[in-house]
């Protein structure tokens, strides 16, 4: 069957996290939160040390709580919304909506510096773009949409994609099949069976399979907490993104 669409996961599929470790990942968020707090101090939204301590403690608690909840419910909690909820709980209201988005930008800014395309990513996308009538998209479980957009633009990769979808924008996370079907719609495609999804984990393969897509697992060396076994028959395995070229007909 002719493949009409190819959906890529972002992290550890198109991009790698430099010298990846769980500790480094969380350190990026700790630095990002400090940067966000500096912004809140500059704008006089947080104006004393006691409220800053309360804010920091509550934000970390909420972020962890919502992340664990999202794994169970598949509902996404965008970072900007977490900032809003924390400030509201501290009775700090009437904050400009743009501030919440800026705080999320700052929170993810250190993480953003660590993501770089795999060495074969751009070359593979260029070759795939030469396939007649093949549409491509990025689909990421990420709580801040602009992080993915910024990185695709930074490395001149936006031009290859007909759609960029994140759980932050859609409201649900992979493996919920709805986010895959929504991505197909954004690509202008109607038949899941003519589309492939390539990702590095359970959410990509199981979700893609439930939505009726063909699936490709991109093997990842680093293991994360919350890993789940993939109980899906007949998915393709690749060790490098360039191997996808062997499976597009």
What are these regions (language model features)?
Residues 63-76, 153:
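Short, electropositive alpha-helical surface patch
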Residues 94-96:
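Long amphipathic N-terminal alpha/beta scaffold segment
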